[in-house]
Design a protein with these regions (language model features):
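N-terminal Rossmann-like FAD-binding beta1-loop-alpha1 element of flavoenzymes
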Residues: 2-28
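Active-site substrate-recognition segment that forms the wall
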Residues: 43-46, 51, 55-95, 225-228, ...
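Rossmann-like flavin
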Residues: 87-204
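Helical element adjacent to the flavin cofactor pocket in flavoenzyme catalytic cores
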Residues: 153-154, 180-242
Length: 414
């Protein structure tokens, strides 16, 4: 079968790779001049398979009020827009801020995340996929507030494989935290989690795909229209050319919303803007070897070979991916206070990207309402973590096979 995939970030590339592995011909379409130049370019790097709790949770609305008073220092910032889409998304987000809803969605995400880890392992072992700074280094979520620690501990279940640590044990796991020991209340450790460079992963997938005669890449081309006949998409229009297809996968991140609106498909996806720094290492002893998430400041740290990736923040503020220097300054200050001397944060490479998120925090994988149009969108901050599993499940369904794990709670409602 001939399958077109729109979007060449980590979700689209993983989908294309899985489809080609399963014997399909793939046309991968990307509006930028190269792959993985947007949300997949400089994200947090953590493959957080066991710590997958959605942003929407009990207590977040009240916290958000306090955060809004902090301005550029706030982990989450809301800037109202004259947009019905934004306000509707925010209302759905508030409705999802219940503990029961959070736990249910976290279970769906954990199921998908653990499958995604298995698929990446199989690709690495069976295909010798490497060259993207992958390590199995574990993840440590540190807490500076006792109430937050108790809340996090209550969410640990047997399947997650997580362990509750006191402050001294946190330092044992990650000695680079020694200067912070007095301010820590404890942590949650996930020894099975991993790290990798998402952009390098994408370029390696592309290199493998280009070796296949079943793969064709279209870059620098925007989709002009989708030609439909009844409940089927017959072709993707690129400029003056029609690309005839048997199936279409939309994996265009936040761009999926506008792309599908003319077909009457209203995706509940909104961009959550995040920021990152990529820092050249200066002092190896001050750089964390383990993935570290500072829960109270909402900052993640991941070592990628000879660099430290620092990522943070959620701006619910529209579709502009430009850098906000006040937010960058906050990130530099927090990183300097947490891992001083690890590198020169003032000279770090700065980046901002738009995470395509649903209000509930769960992605939309599978059917769209059209017979041959499929979705793989809405992964939020977990796109890299969930990419391989999402790709495997969707390519199985497209090929007529049952998915390896249930897509319950991970699809567009009928």
């Amino acid at each position: 079968m001939r399958v077109a995939v729109i979007g060449a970030g980590v979700i689209g590339l993983a989908t294309a790779y899985s489809l080609v592995r399963q014997g399909h011909s793939v046309e991968l379409i990307e509006r930028r001049d190269d792959v993985a130049l947007e949300t997949s370019f400089a994200n947090g790097g953590q493959l957080s398979y066991r710590y997958v709790s959605p942003l929407a949770d009990a207590g977040v609305p009240l916290q958000a009020i306090g955060w809004m008073l902090r301005g550029a220092d706030a982990p989450l910032r809301f800037r109202p827009q004259a947009s019905l889409h934004q306000w509707r998304w925010c209302l759905q987000f508030l409705l999802a801020c219940r503990r029961s809803v959070n736990r249910r969605n976290a279970a769906h995400l954990l199921r998908l995340a653990l499958h995604s880890q298995q698929i990446l392992r199989s690709w690495r072992e069976q295909d010798q996929l490497d060259g993207f700074a992958w390590r199995a280094n574990g993840k440590l979520v540190i807490y500076r507030d006792q109430h937050s620690l108790h809340k996090g501990a209550a969410a640990i279940d047997d399947e997650s494989g997580q362990r509750l640590l006191d402050a001294a044990q946190c330092v044992d796991v990650e000695p680079a935290l020694t200067p912070l020991a007095a301010s820590l209340r404890g942590g949650i450790y996930s020894p099975g989690d991993e790290v990798a460079d998402c952009h390098l992963f994408c370029t390696e997938l592309l290199r493998r795909l280009r070796a296949s005669p079943a793969f064709h890449l279209h870059t620098g081309q925007s989709v002009s229209a989708l030609r439909t006949e009844g409940k089927r998409v017959r072709a993707v229009v690129l400029g003056h050319d029609d690309v005839a297809i048997d199936h279409l996968v939309v994996a265009a991140g936040t761009g999926s919303v506008g792309l599908l609106r003319p077909l009457g498909i209203d995706l509940p996806i909104y961009p959550l803007k995040g920021y990152s720094l990529t820092v050249a290492l200066a002092d190896q002893d001050r750089v964390p070897q383990t993935n570290v998430t500072d829960y109270d400041n909402k900052v993640v740290y991941a070592r990628l070979d000879d660099q430290l990736r620092v990522a943070a923040m959620v701006d619910i503020a529209g579709w502009d991916a430009g850098l906000d220097q006040q937010r960058i300054a906050t990130l530099q200050r927090l990183a300097s206070a947490t891992f001083p001397g690890a590198g020169d944060y003032q000279r770090a490479r700065q980046w901002a990207g738009l995470r395509p998120a649903t209000p509930q925090g769960t992605p939309l994988i599978g059917r769209s309402g059209f017979d041959n149009l499929w979705l793989n969108v809405g992964h939020g901050s977990l796109g890299f973590t969930l990419a391989c599993g999402s790709a495997d499940l969707l390519s199985s369904v497209i090929g007529g096979s049952p998915p390896a794990v249930s897509l319950d709670g991970l699809s567009l409602p009928a």
